[in-house]
């Protein structure tokens, strides 16, 4: 449990100093020049990027030859040959086919075509594309000194096109980008992406030892040679909820390994935060979360999507964070000398301390991405509307948005709020941009529900309402990282048996563990997160801490009430999953059956009036709830008591319940 004698004054000084020093760069709108000059001239201009000082100049074919002749790949080829009984030459040919399918073929003519086409598209779609120039300058310096790995957040298909467009604009080396095999199947477009720097990989490799060897050697060869910055999405896939996803470690392990083996002096990891004022795929994501199959990537689908060009998607902010030195991070954490005990070309499973280091690094990078996400007024408005599904008077929404703005800024949120603009104008402007999600009628603001074309069943009406709620939730989710820790403390205070700090901490710790699949909570940071939450709530006057108690102040009631409401959908979602597992789940339930079964169970509860939360229908929440239950230690029973605005649920979860899965 948390120390009863923790020096909170020291913590206040430490966190206060950190937040005071959180000075972020300013932005430049790169579309401003595009609106005032020739796009063709821009695309055909002299492009002479600064390169890594240790670069080994080579063309794509030379790069492939280096990979195919590498000692590590030959070792695996011989291993696979012995296991399969096939001749090494045949396995070598398989490796060559895999590499041919995978490798990029960067061509400047294709890059120039994209530069021209994207200029036209971006000027139509977006009001501004804002980039922090100081971040670009830091990146330019980093690229010259050491191999660079770009790690953008991933919320839209637009992300990797946007990244390459920005680097081309600033005359920086274009990255080679890890892309899913889905894109390769797009006629013409797949090859164009390949010729603009994309290399294609399978979504999963299974136990394919040869594929993994070709893939990892290809990436490491590009890194060692300084061929180009490497770009991939640490989250692995687009976040349909606009919350950060638990990082995937495979590619990160690969790009860090050359440093551990002494093949490069250092590797710079650059977190990039891409913030969309309005998400292109907002309704598509909501439907996917409700079980509608994801549309297959195709050229015809891309052409049909041209209708989005008639829409206004507001602004994009792209923030290039401080380059993170792997060498500095690893100092005192990983003993690199152990790597000298084995031949470098023999693939080995990462050591435990290395796995721990890579995992910790991945979480820290995603936290840096979150910290530099730019929040627009709409994310605050969406947070308020979701806690008032019956709607709010426009004047009340305006007043509460201003209040929430102050709270967010006091918690060091990176908020893009128009200078000197009246709050009423900011709110009306946001409502106009997001008119597909919210509308004003009779002076009252409420969520928009799609109009049915004909008679609908109660289930269909519920689905339409859920699409609206989940679309709105994707914006609310963008501010969760700012309020998460104080919100968990607010729920813990509401749930704890007493106001004693240790009691509250125990509830906080349980919530922290439960929600570790839904939010980015760095392993081992439970106490630190609790202490930060205490500091922030004390700072805003929401709680006071006499002796060993944590007590709400008179001023704290609206703050704690808002925070409880913020996590209410997640509490209710997990509660519904627990109810389903305890009351409904049958023997031998598979994961494939689990999602539709829980959704059907939740639909019945909503239609019967026993549940008011539409977010419990989200497959993302249902998967995360199950993952949390399976991850946690159920050697003894947990009594889950969830107090909420609507209900108190108590469920005994035991191994016997989970054994049904």
Task: List the model feature ranges, each with a label.
Residues 1-661:
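Membrane-interfacial terminal anchoring regions of lipid-handling membrane enzymes
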């Amino acid at each position: 449990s948390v120390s009863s004698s923790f020096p909170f004054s020291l913590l206040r000084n430490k966190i206060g100093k950190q937040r005071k020093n959180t000075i972020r760069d300013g932005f430049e709108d790169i579309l401003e020049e595009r609106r005032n000059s020739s796009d063709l001239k821009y695309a055909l201009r002299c492009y002479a990027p600064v390169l890594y000082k240790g670069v080994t100049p080579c063309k794509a074919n030379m790069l492939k030859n280096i990979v195919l002749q590498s000692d590590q790949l030959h070792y695996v080829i011989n291993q696979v040959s012995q296991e399969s009984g096939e001749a090494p030459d045949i396995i070598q040919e398989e490796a060559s086919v895999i590499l041919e399918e995978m490798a990029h073929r960067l061509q400047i003519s294709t890059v120039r075509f994209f530069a021209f086409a994207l200029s036209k598209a971006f000027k139509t779609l977006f009001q501004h594309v804002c980039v922090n120039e100081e971040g670009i300058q830091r990146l330019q310096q980093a690229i010259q000194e050491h191999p660079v790995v770009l790690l953008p957040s991933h919320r839209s298909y637009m992300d990797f096109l946007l990244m390459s467009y920005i680097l081309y604009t600033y005359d920086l080396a274009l990255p080679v980008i890890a892309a899913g095999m889905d894109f390769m199947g797009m006629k013409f477009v797949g090859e164009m992406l390949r010729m603009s720097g994309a290399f294609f990989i399978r979504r999963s490799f299974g136990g394919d030892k040869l594929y993994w060897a070709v893939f990892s050697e290809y990436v490491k060869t590009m890194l060692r040679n300084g061929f180009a910055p490497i770009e991939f999405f640490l989250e692995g896939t687009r976040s349909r909820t606009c919350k950060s996803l638990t990082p995937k470690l495979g590619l990160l392990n690969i790009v860090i390994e050359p440093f551990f083996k002494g093949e490069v002096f250092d590797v710079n990891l650059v977190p990039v935060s891409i913030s969309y004022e309005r998400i292109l795929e907002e309704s598509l994501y909501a439907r996917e979360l409700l079980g509608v199959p994801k549309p297959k990537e195709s050229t015809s689908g891309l052409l049909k999507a041209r209708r989005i060009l008639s829409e206004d998607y507001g602004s994009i902010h792209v923030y290039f964070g401080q380059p993170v030195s792997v060498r500095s991070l690893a100092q005192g954490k990983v003993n690199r000398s152990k790597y000298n005990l084995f031949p470098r070309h023999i693939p080995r499973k990462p050591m435990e301390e290395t796995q721990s280091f890579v995992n910790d690094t991945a979480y820290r990078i995603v936290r840096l991405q979150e910290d530099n996400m730019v929040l627009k007024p709409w994310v605050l408005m969406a947070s308020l509307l979701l806690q008032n599904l019956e709607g709010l008077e426009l004047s009340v929404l305006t007043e509460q948005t201003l209040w929430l703005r102050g709270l967010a800024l006091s918690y060091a949120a990176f908020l893009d709020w128009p200078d000197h603009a009246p709050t009423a104008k900011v709110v009306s402007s946001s409502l106009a941009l997001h008119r597909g999600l919210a509308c004003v009628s009779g002076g009252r603001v409420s969520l928009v529900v799609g109009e049915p074309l004909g008679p609908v069943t109660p289930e269909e009406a519920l689905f339409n309402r859920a699409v609206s709620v989940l679309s709105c939730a994707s914006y609310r989710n963008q501010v969760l990282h700012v309020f998460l820790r104080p919100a968990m403390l607010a729920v813990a205070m509401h749930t704890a048996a007493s106001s004693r700090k240790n009691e509250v901490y125990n509830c906080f710790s349980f919530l922290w563990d439960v929600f570790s699949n839904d939010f980015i909570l760095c392993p081992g940071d439970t106490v630190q997160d609790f202490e930060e939450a205490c500091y922030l709530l004390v700072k805003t006057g929401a709680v006071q801490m006499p002796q060993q108690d944590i007590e709400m102040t008179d001023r704290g009631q609206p703050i704690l009430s808002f925070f409880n409401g913020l996590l209410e959908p997640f509490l209710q979602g997990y509660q519904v999953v627990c109810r389903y597992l305890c009351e409904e789940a049958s023997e031998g339930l598979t994961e494939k059956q689990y999602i539709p079964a829980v959704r059907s169970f939740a639909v019945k509860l909503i239609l019967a009036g026993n549940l008011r939360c539409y977010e419990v229908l989200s497959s993302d929440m249902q998967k995360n709830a199950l993952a949390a239950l399976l991850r946690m230690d159920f050697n003894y029973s947990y009594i889950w008591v969830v107090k909420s605005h609507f209900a108190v649920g108590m469920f005994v979860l035991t191994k016997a319940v989970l054994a049904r899965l």
